[in-house]
């Protein structure tokens, strides 16, 4: 589904918490920080599915989204430090440095 369609569904009362809060993941991938903020304001759980949102944002190098999710309590060490490993594999040094500065372990 497109981001616009998801927002329309949310505005019409669709439950955004279904399917492990999957709606937060695609927006994190596409770095729509304002959309992520909106979804969170509507009750999306950024910690769903073992903090998948912060892992996807890290994998794609979206530092602003990563910082926002961390500010809301995302666990950067979830899934054995997957976020920092994905950021490293994809060459996102700024994300790697940020996550390591917060205690993520790159091994």
UniProtKB/Swiss-Prot annotation:
UniProt entry tagged with the keyword Repeat: yes
Pfam families in UniProt: Ank_2
Domain of life: Viruses
Gene3D superfamilies: Ankyrin repeat-containing domain (1.25.40.20)
ANK repeats: 19-48, 49-78, 80-107
InterPro entries: Ankyrin_rpt, Ankyrin_rpt-contain_sf
Keywords associated with the record: ANK repeat, Repeat
SUPFAM superfamilies: Ankyrin repeat
UniProt keyword annotation of Transmembrane present: no
PANTHER family documented for this protein: ANKYRIN REPEAT PROTEIN, GH09064P
Protein name stated in the entry: Putative ankyrin repeat protein L14
Originating organism: Acanthamoeba polyphaga mimivirus (APMV)
Lineage: Viruses, Varidnaviria, Bamfordvirae, Nucleocytoviricota, Megaviricetes
């Amino acid at each position: 589904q497109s981001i616009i369609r998801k927002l329309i569904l949310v505005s019409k009362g669709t439950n955004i918490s279904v399917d492990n809060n999957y709606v937060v993941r695609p927006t994190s991938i596409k770095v729509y920080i304002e959309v992520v903020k909106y979804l969170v304001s509507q009750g999306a759980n950024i910690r769903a599915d073992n903090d998948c949102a912060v892992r996807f944002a890290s994998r794609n190098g979206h530092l602003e989204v990563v910082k926002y999710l961390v500010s809301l309590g995302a666990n950067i060490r979830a899934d054995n430090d997957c976020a920092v490993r994905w950021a490293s594999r994809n060459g996102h040094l700024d994300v790697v440095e940020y996550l390591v500065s917060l205690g993520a372990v790159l091994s």
